[in-house]
């Protein structure tokens, strides 16, 4: 357990090299201390119980006790925030881990250049600092009935922005939206390239909507969910009387790609008073400027409530702008959107 503001971390990884590398990164700052390391889930679970660390970093592919089983047992016996360290080759595995209660994940760089490893160090420390303040727990989401896509314009186009804690939150929102007439949902989730495709594929298999990673030129369709591609933006544009999606590359000054602000601003410009943006859990302030733009255009912005957010950074910053019309618990966002879609039919 931490003392005097120092965050205690347990590193679990079956690779001795990875354990050393992560430990060095974590202890490069004075407010973080690695209390111990473990080579597998069984050893890790015992050390969590004994040492009570503030945060755990976890490799999912381990001998004896794998990552999924470790998470299930941990959340039952000693709930602790977990950051999954994932390779690109196992990118689809992280979403199951998030459902089982993991706080967030970090993608190992495909090419461990100095710049890539420094970016990993910065991201790791940022997420460890955020994780110590959350209340971990098992998140279960049951599949819903699949909404039917129909031709024509959707009665409602919803832009959803999320970061840390977002994948399970997005899934929860979609489960409340299997309604007629079917809306269209545009999701901007901070996530690396390739992981967004895996995220879309997983939601498509288990959720109530047809879900794809957005491609440049996609027409906005009712009953469809589009996930912004990692490493690019997703914006709404007009194509004659229809709406289309564009996926421009980021500029050198962009902090996030995809960026919630960029999506919300495009919604405000194209849809005006019909624009609707929802800011879900996440670190930072992405979405706040976009919320202002939607509000100025006469549209609506909703934000996830603090008590249901894994991290209240993004919703809190959006609320602070004065542009948010409704602050809603996560479980009520989907039904509220469904009710709005019915009114707009």
Swiss-Prot record:
PROSITE patterns: CHEB, RESPONSE_REGULATORY. Residues 8-123 form the Response regulatory domain. The modification 4-aspartylphosphate is found at residue 59. Its main location: cytoplasm. The keyword Cell division does not apply. GO terms for biological process: chemotaxis. It holds the Pfam family CheB_methylest. CDD domains: CheB_Rec, REC_CheB-like. It is found in: Cytoplasm. GO terms for molecular function: phosphorelay response regulator activity; protein-glutamate methylesterase activity; protein-glutamine glutaminase activity. The active site is at 163, 190, 286. Transmembrane segments: none annotated. Belongs to the CheB family. This is Protein-glutamate methylesterase/protein-glutamine glutaminase 1. It comes from Myxococcus xanthus (strain DK1622). The gene is cheB1.
